[in-house]
Regions:
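Short glycine/threonine-rich loop/turn motifs
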Residues: 67-166
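Short, small/acidic-rich helices and loops at N termini and domain boundaries
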Residues: 1-5
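Short, glycine/charged-enriched hinge/interface segments at domain edges or termini
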Residues: 6-96
């Protein structure tokens, strides 16, 4: 990730000290890079038709056996779990507790998708996390994750973001 700082350089002659004082951060600089990479990935996946593969799978009329990929602490998961419980419908939830941000997140999510794909006791797979900064959510702009979703033997639904993302 690239970051642009607006700085002031200060030199204190008496002690021979050089200071770099950060005055501001150009957040649009990094956001522009993230957006460009995301658009390129989307274009590449659309060209391959990856976006349509998982959509062809039949969704059960009432999917009761839910394979959920999320952090057990994610706001989106906690809210969804509350809704499932309050619905009075007999959902059977299997959670695959993963990191939903950071270096390990994409590979953990891909592994969880592959694990649920091999299971016959799952009706649908759901990937969930709460909101966050565009940088935090960028982990989901991952080609290996998109390919894993397209290859999953169960329909995959996503719930990414929560209230207002920053």
């Amino acid at each position: 990730m690239r970051v642009r700082f607006f700085c002031e350089i200060d030199f204190y002659i008496v002690r021979g000290e050089l200071s770099l004082i950060i005055k501001d951060v150009d957040t649009q600089f990094t956001v522009g890079d993230i957006a460009a990479k995301r658009e390129e990935l989307i274009r590449k996946l659309l060209e391959k038709g990856v976006d349509k593969i998982n959509k062809r799978l039949e969704v059960p009329l009432v999917p009761l056996r839910l394979g959920i990929i999320s952090s057990s602490q994610a706001a989106g998961y906690i809210d969804a779990l509350k809704q499932f419980e309050e619905s009075g419908i007999g959902f059977h939830i299997t959670l695959c507790d993963v990191n939903v941000q950071g270096e390990a997140a994409a590979s953990q999510i891909v592994a969880a998708i592959q694990t649920f794909s091999r299971r016959s006791d799952i009706d649908i797979v759901m990937i969930m996390r709460g909101g966050g900064s565009k940088g935090d959510l960028a982990v989901f702009d991952d080609e290996s994750m998109a390919l894993a979703i397209s290859r999953c033997k169960h329909p995959v639904f996503t719930g990414i973001g929560h209230e207002i993302d920053t």
